[in-house]
From Swiss-Prot:
Keywords: Amino-acid biosynthesis, Aromatic amino acid biosynthesis, Cytoplasm, Transferase. Phosphoenolpyruvate binds at K28, G101, R129, Q177, R361, R405. It comes from Methylorubrum populi (strain ATCC BAA-705 / NCIMB 13946 / BJ001) (Methylobacterium populi). Its EC number is 2.5.1.19. This is 3-phosphoshikimate 1-carboxyvinyltransferase. Residues 1-25 are annotated as: Disordered. 3-phosphoshikimate binds at K28, S29, R33, S175, Q177, D330, K357. Pathway: Metabolic intermediate biosynthesis; chorismate biosynthesis; chorismate from D-erythrose 4-phosphate and phosphoenolpyruvate: step 6/7. Monomer. SUPFAM superfamilies: EPT/RTPC-like. NCBIfam families: aroA. Belongs to the EPSP synthase family.
Amino acid sequence: MSHDSEPQPVTAHPAGPLTGALKPPGDKSISHRAMIFGLLSVGETRVEGLLEGDDVLRTAAAVKALGAQVTREGEGRWRIVGVGIGGMQDPVGVLDFGNAGTGSRLMMGVVGGQPVTATFDGDASLRKRPMRRILDPILKMGAEVVSEAEGGRVPLTLRGPREAIPIRYELPVASAQIKSAVLLAGLNAPGTTTVIEKAASRDHTERMLRLFGADVSVTPSGEGGHGRTVTLTGQPTLRGTDVIVPADPSSAAFPLVAALIVPGSEVILRGVMMNPLRTGLITTLIEMGADIERFDEREEGGETVADLRVRASRLRGVDVPAERAPSMIDEYPILAVAAAFAEGTTRMNGLHELRVKESDRLAAVAAGLAANGVGHDIEGDDLIVTGNGGPPAGGGTVATHLDHRIAMAFLVMGLATRKPVTVDDGAMIATSFPSFRPTMLALGARIEDGAAA
Protein backbone atom coordinates (compact mmCIF):
# COMPACT_ATOMS: atom_id res chain seq x y z
CA MET A 1 0.00 0.00 0.00
CA SER A 2 1.37 3.43 -0.85
CA HIS A 3 1.42 6.09 1.84
CA ASP A 4 -1.12 8.29 0.04
CA SER A 5 -3.92 5.71 -0.42
CA GLU A 6 -7.32 6.16 1.23
CA PRO A 7 -7.73 3.99 4.36
CA GLN A 8 -9.95 0.93 3.89
CA PRO A 9 -11.62 -0.06 7.21
CA VAL A 10 -12.44 -3.75 7.69
CA THR A 11 -14.58 -5.39 10.40
CA ALA A 12 -14.54 -8.95 11.76
CA HIS A 13 -17.74 -10.27 13.34
CA PRO A 14 -18.13 -13.10 15.87
CA ALA A 15 -18.32 -16.33 13.87
CA GLY A 16 -19.49 -19.90 14.24
CA PRO A 17 -16.97 -22.76 14.18
CA LEU A 18 -14.16 -22.50 11.62
CA THR A 19 -13.67 -25.72 9.66
CA GLY A 20 -11.69 -26.86 6.64
CA ALA A 21 -8.16 -27.23 5.30
CA LEU A 22 -5.87 -24.64 3.75
CA LYS A 23 -2.33 -24.14 2.48
CA PRO A 24 -1.06 -20.85 3.92
CA PRO A 25 0.84 -18.58 1.51
CA GLY A 26 4.49 -19.16 0.74
CA ASP A 27 7.02 -18.06 3.32
CA LYS A 28 7.91 -14.39 2.92
CA SER A 29 11.49 -14.74 4.18
CA ILE A 30 12.28 -17.55 1.73
CA SER A 31 10.44 -15.85 -1.15
CA HIS A 32 12.59 -12.71 -0.82
CA ARG A 33 15.75 -14.81 -0.64
CA ALA A 34 14.81 -17.01 -3.61
CA MET A 35 14.54 -13.89 -5.77
CA ILE A 36 17.81 -12.43 -4.47
CA PHE A 37 19.79 -15.65 -4.89
CA GLY A 38 18.32 -16.01 -8.37
CA LEU A 39 19.90 -12.62 -9.18
CA LEU A 40 23.30 -13.54 -7.66
CA SER A 41 23.58 -16.95 -9.32
CA VAL A 42 24.65 -18.02 -12.78
CA GLY A 43 21.99 -19.68 -14.90
CA GLU A 44 18.33 -20.34 -14.26
CA THR A 45 16.46 -20.47 -10.95
CA ARG A 46 12.89 -21.74 -10.86
CA VAL A 47 10.71 -20.96 -7.86
CA GLU A 48 7.45 -22.68 -6.91
CA GLY A 49 5.06 -21.44 -4.23
CA LEU A 50 6.44 -17.89 -4.17
CA LEU A 51 4.46 -15.50 -1.99
CA GLU A 52 3.02 -13.01 -4.47
CA GLY A 53 2.40 -10.30 -1.89
CA ASP A 54 3.42 -6.71 -2.48
CA ASP A 55 6.63 -7.01 -0.42
CA VAL A 56 8.04 -9.88 -2.48
CA LEU A 57 6.91 -8.35 -5.78
CA ARG A 58 8.91 -5.22 -4.86
CA THR A 59 11.99 -7.41 -4.37
CA ALA A 60 11.30 -9.11 -7.72
CA ALA A 61 11.16 -5.67 -9.38
CA ALA A 62 14.48 -4.69 -7.74
CA VAL A 63 16.11 -7.94 -8.89
CA LYS A 64 14.97 -7.20 -12.44
CA ALA A 65 16.20 -3.58 -12.21
CA LEU A 66 19.65 -4.86 -11.19
CA GLY A 67 19.93 -6.95 -14.36
CA ALA A 68 18.24 -10.34 -13.87
CA GLN A 69 15.61 -11.72 -16.23
CA VAL A 70 12.48 -12.25 -14.13
CA THR A 71 9.43 -14.04 -15.55
CA ARG A 72 6.17 -15.08 -13.91
CA GLU A 73 5.14 -18.42 -15.41
CA GLY A 74 1.98 -19.08 -13.39
CA GLU A 75 0.53 -18.69 -9.91
CA GLY A 76 3.51 -18.77 -7.53
CA ARG A 77 5.79 -20.03 -10.33
CA TRP A 78 8.70 -17.78 -11.33
CA ARG A 79 11.85 -18.05 -13.43
CA ILE A 80 14.95 -15.94 -12.75
CA VAL A 81 18.05 -15.87 -14.95
CA GLY A 82 20.80 -14.37 -12.83
CA VAL A 83 23.84 -12.22 -13.54
CA GLY A 84 26.21 -13.79 -11.02
CA ILE A 85 28.26 -12.13 -8.28
CA GLY A 86 29.80 -8.91 -9.62
CA GLY A 87 27.57 -8.87 -12.71
CA MET A 88 24.84 -6.44 -11.66
CA GLN A 89 24.01 -3.20 -13.45
CA ASP A 90 23.09 0.18 -11.96
CA PRO A 91 19.28 0.34 -11.87
CA VAL A 92 17.47 3.00 -13.87
CA GLY A 93 15.39 4.89 -11.32
CA VAL A 94 14.69 4.27 -7.64
CA LEU A 95 14.29 0.83 -6.04
CA ASP A 96 10.89 1.36 -4.36
CA PHE A 97 10.35 -1.31 -1.70
CA GLY A 98 6.92 -0.11 -0.55
CA ASN A 99 6.46 -1.57 2.95
CA ALA A 100 9.13 -4.29 2.56
CA GLY A 101 11.60 -4.02 5.44
CA THR A 102 13.10 -7.45 4.73
CA GLY A 103 13.49 -6.90 0.99
CA SER A 104 15.05 -3.46 1.36
CA ARG A 105 17.50 -4.51 4.07
CA LEU A 106 18.64 -7.69 2.35
CA MET A 107 19.09 -5.81 -0.91
CA MET A 108 21.21 -3.20 0.87
CA GLY A 109 23.54 -6.07 1.70
CA VAL A 110 23.59 -7.12 -1.96
CA VAL A 111 24.23 -3.60 -3.31
CA GLY A 112 26.66 -2.81 -0.48
CA GLY A 113 28.99 -5.60 -1.57
CA GLN A 114 28.88 -5.13 -5.36
CA PRO A 115 30.17 -2.49 -7.80
CA VAL A 116 26.77 -0.86 -8.25
CA THR A 117 24.95 2.29 -7.07
CA ALA A 118 21.25 2.23 -6.17
CA THR A 119 18.70 4.46 -4.44
CA PHE A 120 16.33 2.80 -1.96
CA ASP A 121 12.91 4.19 -1.01
CA GLY A 122 9.57 3.00 0.34
CA ASP A 123 6.22 4.01 1.74
CA ALA A 124 5.54 6.21 4.78
CA SER A 125 5.97 3.25 7.14
CA LEU A 126 9.31 2.12 5.65
CA ARG A 127 10.61 5.69 5.71
CA LYS A 128 10.26 5.65 9.51
CA ARG A 129 12.17 2.40 10.02
CA PRO A 130 15.85 2.49 11.09
CA MET A 131 18.43 1.28 8.58
CA ARG A 132 21.57 2.29 10.50
CA ARG A 133 22.09 -1.19 12.01
CA ILE A 134 22.16 -2.63 8.48
CA LEU A 135 24.41 0.11 7.13
CA ASP A 136 27.04 0.02 9.91
CA PRO A 137 28.62 -3.34 8.96
CA ILE A 138 28.16 -2.76 5.22
CA LEU A 139 30.10 0.50 5.44
CA LYS A 140 32.91 -1.41 7.15
CA MET A 141 32.92 -3.69 4.09
CA GLY A 142 33.58 -0.81 1.70
CA ALA A 143 30.12 0.50 0.83
CA GLU A 144 29.45 4.23 0.80
CA VAL A 145 26.23 6.10 1.62
CA VAL A 146 25.96 8.81 -1.04
CA SER A 147 22.83 10.38 0.48
CA GLU A 148 20.26 9.46 3.13
CA ALA A 149 17.25 10.76 5.02
CA GLU A 150 17.75 11.84 8.63
CA GLY A 151 18.86 9.05 10.96
CA GLY A 152 20.03 6.69 8.21
CA ARG A 153 16.53 6.14 6.85
CA VAL A 154 15.24 5.81 3.28
CA PRO A 155 15.33 7.40 0.80
CA LEU A 156 19.05 6.62 0.68
CA THR A 157 21.58 6.01 -2.07
CA LEU A 158 24.19 3.30 -1.56
CA ARG A 159 27.34 2.75 -3.62
CA GLY A 160 29.07 -0.61 -3.37
CA PRO A 161 32.81 -1.34 -3.80
CA ARG A 162 34.55 -3.19 -6.63
CA GLU A 163 35.21 -5.91 -4.08
CA ALA A 164 33.82 -6.05 -0.55
CA ILE A 165 36.17 -6.21 2.44
CA PRO A 166 35.78 -9.43 4.44
CA ILE A 167 34.99 -8.72 8.09
CA ARG A 168 34.36 -10.47 11.39
CA TYR A 169 31.19 -8.92 12.78
CA GLU A 170 29.44 -9.45 16.11
CA LEU A 171 25.73 -8.65 15.86
CA PRO A 172 24.52 -6.05 18.38
CA VAL A 173 21.13 -7.82 18.53
CA ALA A 174 19.78 -11.16 17.29
CA SER A 175 18.69 -10.14 13.79
CA ALA A 176 18.47 -12.35 10.72
CA GLN A 177 18.26 -9.21 8.58
CA ILE A 178 21.59 -7.77 9.76
CA LYS A 179 23.26 -11.19 9.60
CA SER A 180 21.92 -11.77 6.09
CA ALA A 181 22.97 -8.33 4.84
CA VAL A 182 26.56 -8.96 6.00
CA LEU A 183 26.62 -12.43 4.41
CA LEU A 184 25.16 -11.13 1.13
CA ALA A 185 27.77 -8.35 1.00
CA GLY A 186 30.42 -10.95 1.87
CA LEU A 187 29.64 -12.93 -1.26
CA ASN A 188 31.80 -10.45 -3.20
CA ALA A 189 34.62 -10.35 -0.63
CA PRO A 190 37.89 -12.23 -1.20
CA GLY A 191 38.48 -14.39 1.84
CA THR A 192 36.24 -15.19 4.79
CA THR A 193 33.35 -13.19 6.23
CA THR A 194 32.29 -14.17 9.77
CA VAL A 195 29.12 -13.22 11.64
CA ILE A 196 28.78 -13.92 15.37
CA GLU A 197 25.35 -13.84 17.01
CA LYS A 198 24.70 -14.17 20.75
CA ALA A 199 21.33 -15.85 20.12
CA ALA A 200 20.42 -17.86 17.04
CA SER A 201 18.18 -15.99 14.58
CA ARG A 202 16.42 -17.28 11.45
CA ASP A 203 18.86 -19.27 9.33
CA HIS A 204 17.15 -19.14 5.92
CA THR A 205 20.05 -17.26 4.32
CA GLU A 206 22.59 -19.86 5.48
CA ARG A 207 20.39 -22.70 4.17
CA MET A 208 19.89 -20.97 0.83
CA LEU A 209 23.60 -20.17 0.47
CA ARG A 210 24.24 -23.93 0.72
CA LEU A 211 21.41 -24.72 -1.71
CA PHE A 212 23.00 -22.42 -4.34
CA GLY A 213 26.51 -23.84 -3.78
CA ALA A 214 28.27 -21.46 -1.37
CA ASP A 215 30.75 -22.67 1.26
CA VAL A 216 29.16 -21.66 4.57
CA SER A 217 29.61 -23.18 8.02
CA VAL A 218 27.55 -22.66 11.18
CA THR A 219 28.88 -23.60 14.63
CA PRO A 220 27.32 -23.13 18.09
CA SER A 221 29.04 -20.46 20.18
CA GLY A 222 28.58 -18.26 23.20
CA GLU A 223 27.08 -18.96 26.59
CA GLY A 224 25.43 -22.37 26.67
CA GLY A 225 25.90 -22.77 22.92
CA HIS A 226 22.82 -20.58 22.25
CA GLY A 227 24.74 -18.34 19.87
CA ARG A 228 26.02 -19.08 16.37
CA THR A 229 29.18 -18.30 14.42
CA VAL A 230 28.54 -18.21 10.67
CA THR A 231 31.53 -18.32 8.31
CA LEU A 232 31.25 -17.68 4.56
CA THR A 233 33.96 -18.15 1.92
CA GLY A 234 33.62 -15.23 -0.49
CA GLN A 235 33.44 -15.01 -4.27
CA PRO A 236 31.88 -18.42 -4.97
CA THR A 237 30.08 -19.18 -8.20
CA LEU A 238 26.45 -19.61 -7.20
CA ARG A 239 24.48 -21.90 -9.53
CA GLY A 240 20.81 -21.39 -10.32
CA THR A 241 18.59 -24.08 -8.83
CA ASP A 242 14.98 -25.03 -8.11
CA VAL A 243 13.37 -23.64 -4.94
CA ILE A 244 10.08 -24.88 -3.47
CA VAL A 245 8.82 -22.28 -0.99
CA PRO A 246 7.16 -23.83 2.10
CA ALA A 247 4.08 -22.27 3.74
CA ASP A 248 4.88 -19.31 5.99
CA PRO A 249 4.49 -20.06 9.72
CA SER A 250 4.04 -16.33 10.39
CA SER A 251 1.01 -16.25 8.06
CA ALA A 252 -0.26 -19.65 9.26
CA ALA A 253 -0.38 -18.10 12.75
CA PHE A 254 -3.57 -16.16 11.95
CA PRO A 255 -5.90 -19.03 10.92
CA LEU A 256 -4.17 -21.18 13.57
CA VAL A 257 -5.05 -18.84 16.46
CA ALA A 258 -8.50 -18.22 14.97
CA ALA A 259 -9.16 -21.97 15.15
CA LEU A 260 -8.01 -22.02 18.80
CA ILE A 261 -10.27 -19.18 19.99
CA VAL A 262 -13.49 -19.70 17.97
CA PRO A 263 -15.44 -22.41 19.85
CA GLY A 264 -15.96 -25.71 18.04
CA SER A 265 -13.36 -25.04 15.34
CA GLU A 266 -11.11 -27.63 13.66
CA VAL A 267 -8.75 -26.53 10.90
CA ILE A 268 -5.92 -28.27 9.03
CA LEU A 269 -2.95 -26.19 7.84
CA ARG A 270 -0.92 -27.91 5.10
CA GLY A 271 2.81 -27.72 4.34
CA VAL A 272 3.78 -25.31 7.14
CA MET A 273 7.52 -24.73 7.60
CA MET A 274 8.76 -26.25 10.88
CA ASN A 275 12.23 -24.66 11.01
CA PRO A 276 12.95 -24.64 14.79
CA LEU A 277 14.05 -21.00 14.54
CA ARG A 278 10.53 -20.08 13.34
CA THR A 279 8.22 -22.17 15.55
CA GLY A 280 8.35 -20.25 18.84
CA LEU A 281 4.65 -19.38 18.58
CA ILE A 282 3.60 -23.02 18.21
CA THR A 283 5.80 -23.99 21.17
CA THR A 284 4.23 -21.22 23.26
CA LEU A 285 0.63 -22.04 22.28
CA ILE A 286 1.14 -25.71 23.17
CA GLU A 287 2.46 -24.57 26.58
CA MET A 288 -0.79 -22.58 26.90
CA GLY A 289 -2.82 -25.75 26.31
CA ALA A 290 -3.46 -25.50 22.57
CA ASP A 291 -4.54 -28.68 20.77
CA ILE A 292 -2.11 -28.65 17.82
CA GLU A 293 -1.26 -31.96 16.16
CA ARG A 294 1.74 -32.13 13.80
CA PHE A 295 1.75 -34.84 11.10
CA ASP A 296 3.13 -35.85 7.69
CA GLU A 297 6.54 -34.24 8.28
CA ARG A 298 8.68 -33.92 5.13
CA GLU A 299 11.42 -31.88 3.40
CA GLU A 300 10.70 -29.06 0.92
CA GLY A 301 13.16 -26.47 -0.42
CA GLY A 302 15.81 -27.31 2.17
CA GLU A 303 13.31 -26.88 5.04
CA THR A 304 11.24 -29.29 7.16
CA VAL A 305 7.49 -28.88 6.66
CA ALA A 306 4.47 -30.55 8.27
CA ASP A 307 0.68 -30.47 8.31
CA LEU A 308 -1.01 -29.14 11.46
CA ARG A 309 -4.43 -30.07 12.84
CA VAL A 310 -5.71 -27.33 15.17
CA ARG A 311 -8.77 -27.61 17.41
CA ALA A 312 -10.47 -24.97 19.59
CA SER A 313 -8.85 -25.03 23.03
CA ARG A 314 -9.08 -23.56 26.52
CA LEU A 315 -5.85 -21.60 26.92
CA ARG A 316 -4.00 -20.56 30.08
CA GLY A 317 -1.52 -17.75 30.65
CA VAL A 318 2.21 -18.48 30.52
CA ASP A 319 5.55 -16.71 30.87
CA VAL A 320 7.27 -16.40 27.46
CA PRO A 321 11.09 -16.19 27.83
CA ALA A 322 12.94 -13.36 26.10
CA GLU A 323 15.31 -15.81 24.38
CA ARG A 324 12.36 -17.19 22.40
CA ALA A 325 11.74 -13.81 20.76
CA PRO A 326 13.95 -14.32 17.65
CA SER A 327 11.94 -17.46 16.72
CA MET A 328 8.59 -15.65 16.89
CA ILE A 329 9.30 -11.93 16.55
CA ASP A 330 6.49 -11.43 13.99
CA GLU A 331 3.98 -13.50 15.97
CA TYR A 332 3.65 -11.42 19.16
CA PRO A 333 0.58 -9.47 17.94
CA ILE A 334 -1.36 -12.69 17.32
CA LEU A 335 0.01 -14.26 20.52
CA ALA A 336 -1.33 -11.23 22.42
CA VAL A 337 -4.74 -11.96 20.88
CA ALA A 338 -4.56 -15.61 22.00
CA ALA A 339 -3.52 -14.42 25.48
CA ALA A 340 -6.61 -12.19 25.64
CA PHE A 341 -8.76 -15.37 25.53
CA ALA A 342 -6.61 -17.32 28.00
CA GLU A 343 -7.24 -17.84 31.70
CA GLY A 344 -4.73 -15.80 33.71
CA THR A 345 -1.71 -13.69 32.87
CA THR A 346 0.64 -14.10 29.90
CA ARG A 347 3.93 -12.23 30.14
CA MET A 348 5.92 -11.73 26.92
CA ASN A 349 9.45 -10.73 27.88
CA GLY A 350 12.08 -8.75 25.96
CA LEU A 351 10.08 -7.25 23.07
CA HIS A 352 12.36 -4.29 22.28
CA GLU A 353 12.56 -5.33 18.60
CA LEU A 354 8.79 -4.85 18.24
CA ARG A 355 9.33 -1.12 18.61
CA VAL A 356 11.17 -0.90 15.26
CA LYS A 357 8.88 -3.04 13.08
CA GLU A 358 6.36 -1.70 10.50
CA SER A 359 4.95 0.27 13.42
CA ASP A 360 5.90 0.47 17.08
CA ARG A 361 4.21 -2.91 17.33
CA LEU A 362 4.40 -3.04 21.10
CA ALA A 363 2.47 0.25 21.44
CA ALA A 364 0.09 -0.71 18.61
CA VAL A 365 -0.76 -4.07 20.20
CA ALA A 366 -1.32 -2.44 23.59
CA ALA A 367 -3.62 0.19 22.06
CA GLY A 368 -5.58 -2.51 20.20
CA LEU A 369 -6.03 -4.53 23.38
CA ALA A 370 -7.18 -1.41 25.26
CA ALA A 371 -9.71 -0.56 22.54
CA ASN A 372 -11.30 -3.99 22.97
CA GLY A 373 -11.46 -4.23 26.75
CA VAL A 374 -8.46 -6.50 27.35
CA GLY A 375 -6.45 -6.10 30.55
CA HIS A 376 -2.80 -5.44 29.78
CA ASP A 377 0.32 -3.61 30.91
CA ILE A 378 3.74 -2.70 29.48
CA GLU A 379 6.71 -2.94 31.85
CA GLY A 380 9.88 -1.83 30.06
CA ASP A 381 10.00 -4.06 26.97
CA ASP A 382 7.62 -6.68 28.43
CA LEU A 383 3.96 -7.02 27.44
CA ILE A 384 1.59 -8.45 30.06
CA VAL A 385 -1.89 -9.59 28.97
CA THR A 386 -4.54 -10.72 31.45
CA GLY A 387 -7.49 -12.81 30.31
CA ASN A 388 -10.39 -14.40 32.20
CA GLY A 389 -10.73 -17.48 30.02
CA GLY A 390 -13.71 -16.07 28.14
CA PRO A 391 -14.16 -13.79 25.14
CA PRO A 392 -13.14 -10.14 25.58
CA ALA A 393 -15.72 -7.42 24.95
CA GLY A 394 -14.45 -6.31 21.53
CA GLY A 395 -16.31 -3.44 19.90
CA GLY A 396 -13.21 -1.30 19.35
CA THR A 397 -11.50 0.22 16.33
CA VAL A 398 -7.79 -0.59 16.07
CA ALA A 399 -5.24 1.79 14.53
CA THR A 400 -3.02 -0.39 12.31
CA HIS A 401 -0.32 2.21 11.52
CA LEU A 402 0.08 0.60 8.05
CA ASP A 403 1.09 -2.69 9.75
CA HIS A 404 -0.28 -5.85 8.12
CA ARG A 405 0.25 -8.06 11.18
CA ILE A 406 -1.61 -5.68 13.51
CA ALA A 407 -4.52 -5.66 11.02
CA MET A 408 -4.74 -9.46 10.72
CA ALA A 409 -4.25 -10.11 14.45
CA PHE A 410 -7.16 -7.91 15.50
CA LEU A 411 -9.43 -9.17 12.71
CA VAL A 412 -8.82 -12.66 14.13
CA MET A 413 -9.72 -11.31 17.58
CA GLY A 414 -13.03 -10.00 16.22
CA LEU A 415 -14.10 -13.50 15.15
CA ALA A 416 -14.46 -14.52 18.82
CA THR A 417 -15.07 -11.34 20.87
CA ARG A 418 -18.56 -10.44 22.11
CA LYS A 419 -18.82 -7.49 19.70
CA PRO A 420 -17.22 -6.96 16.25
CA VAL A 421 -13.71 -5.53 15.94
CA THR A 422 -12.78 -2.98 13.25
CA VAL A 423 -9.29 -2.20 11.94
CA ASP A 424 -8.89 1.27 10.47
CA ASP A 425 -7.16 0.02 7.32
CA GLY A 426 -6.90 -3.47 5.85
CA ALA A 427 -5.24 -2.60 2.53
CA MET A 428 -1.70 -3.42 3.65
CA ILE A 429 -2.62 -7.05 4.45
CA ALA A 430 -1.66 -7.70 0.81
CA THR A 431 2.01 -7.20 1.71
CA SER A 432 2.24 -10.68 3.28
CA PHE A 433 -1.11 -12.54 2.93
CA PRO A 434 -3.01 -11.35 -0.17
CA SER A 435 -5.59 -14.16 0.17
CA PHE A 436 -6.22 -13.61 3.92
CA ARG A 437 -9.88 -12.65 3.59
CA PRO A 438 -10.99 -15.31 1.08
CA THR A 439 -9.00 -17.91 3.05
CA MET A 440 -10.71 -16.98 6.32
CA LEU A 441 -14.15 -16.69 4.68
CA ALA A 442 -13.76 -20.21 3.25
CA LEU A 443 -13.25 -21.50 6.82
CA GLY A 444 -16.48 -19.81 7.94
CA ALA A 445 -15.26 -16.43 9.18
CA ARG A 446 -17.27 -13.24 8.77
CA ILE A 447 -15.07 -10.33 7.68
CA GLU A 448 -16.61 -7.34 5.90
CA ASP A 449 -15.56 -4.02 4.39
CA GLY A 450 -16.26 -0.88 6.38
CA ALA A 451 -16.60 -0.02 10.05
CA ALA A 452 -19.02 -1.86 12.35
CA ALA A 453 -22.58 -0.58 12.06
